[in-house]
Curated annotation (Swiss-Prot):
GO biological process: tRNA modification
Family assignment from sequence similarity: Belongs to the TmcAL family.
HAMAP family: TmcAL (MF_01539)
Descriptive protein name: tRNA(Met) cytidine acetate ligase
GO MF entries: ATP binding; ligase activity, forming carbon-nitrogen bonds; tRNA binding
Catalysed reactions listed for this entry: cytidine(34) in elongator tRNA(Met) + acetate + ATP = N(4)-acetylcytidine(34) in elongator tRNA(Met) + AMP + diphosphate
Keywords: ATP-binding, Cytoplasm, Ligase, Nucleotide-binding, RNA-binding, tRNA processing, tRNA-binding
Purpose: Catalyzes the formation of N(4)-acetylcytidine (ac(4)C) at the wobble position of elongator tRNA(Met), using acetate and ATP as substrates. First activates an acetate ion to form acetyladenylate (Ac-AMP) and then transfers the acetyl group to tRNA to form ac(4)C34.
The organism of origin for this protein: Listeria welshimeri serovar 6b (strain ATCC 35897 / DSM 20650 / CCUG 15529 / CIP 8149 / NCTC 11857 / SLCC 5334 / V8)
Enzyme nomenclature, EC number: 6.3.4.-
Keyword flag tRNA-binding: yes
Main localisation: cytoplasm
PANTHER family recorded: TRNA(MET) CYTIDINE ACETATE LIGASE
Chain sites annotated for binding ATP: 7-20, 101, 162, 187-188
Amino acid sequence: MKATGIVVEYNPFHNGHQLHLNKARELTKADVVIAVMSGSFVQRGEPAILPKWERTKMALAAGVDMVVELPVSFATQHATIFAEESVRILDALHVDALFFGSEHGVSEDFLTAAKTVVEHEASFNQAIQLALIDKKTSYARAYTETFKQSFGTELLDVTKPNNILGFHYALAIQKQNPTISLQTMARIHAGYHDIEANHDQIASATAIRKLLLAGNLEEASRYLPASSIEILKNYDGPFLSWENYWALLKYRLIQAETDELEGIRNVSEGIQNRMQIAATKAQYFSDFIESMKTKRYSNARIQRTALQILLNARNIPSAPYIRILGMNKTGQKYLSHHKKNISLPIVTTVSKAAPGLLEEDLRATNIYTLVKGLENYQAGDFHIPPILKSQT
């Protein structure tokens, strides 16, 4: 069976995702499509708008054959780690191809850039460090500037969010397993960060979340496949944003000793001091973010750091594993065929996992489900089994 991997958040699953999924299967001639999906919290350091099990249902209903959770310690990191660990999981699952959407749309250019960086990695990394020192900027901006100086923007514009992720997928493949085929398609219409829905059928997940958070499911439905609409109508919990967790974060920042926060992942350069001061003054999370923004700290950096503090994520290495969230019969058949040759631990029953392996994800779920209306999902990692979809 030919397998194609995709890296997703489905926050929530919309028409653009359906197009991407269909093209992934068509263009790579895949027999099975495996999605590595963020769990309770997503890459920009935000809570997912829906629990991971509802988003897994959406993925399976739309045609994904297997959904695997990207551990929270990797899912909420910058593009390098996010991509490296996603590729590590897909490689362990023996995928033949990785398919992604990008603003650029030309697979060969991602591979060319990645190969060049791998060949000159030491000098490239040195240039990034110099940019960090000289310009007192964020790591993401330093990386982007170094890339632009090395390649210009004609080869690949890494200021675009999906281009930079795609580049890091290509980089990870070059380092881990160059036999994996990398293929992309150009994103159409809605940009990743567009906050307004302005097309008949395609809108960004950001714009759709804005509609859902405003209670406008009917308007959001224009941009969702029928299967997602049905799942949303049957969902009786709240739609979530950072504001749901602001009181928890504010308490954590106010009560903690400054040196206690130094061992938290992503906490460096005294950012915790600024956060603690900002937390005492901000009424809402949006106020907190605005008061924290500087040239050095992007929104994403602030949110990721805030999330690590909320989750009490210590700055220690995490081990990768394969946590199955859901499968259809094709996915089950594929897993059964390859199970003996998969190098990472496979988790289908959390209670049987090695001690400590899922500790951070279990804590993330427990914190995520503290919000009123999510009582049915509390301790869900233990009582909600992998979702098995029958194929008709």
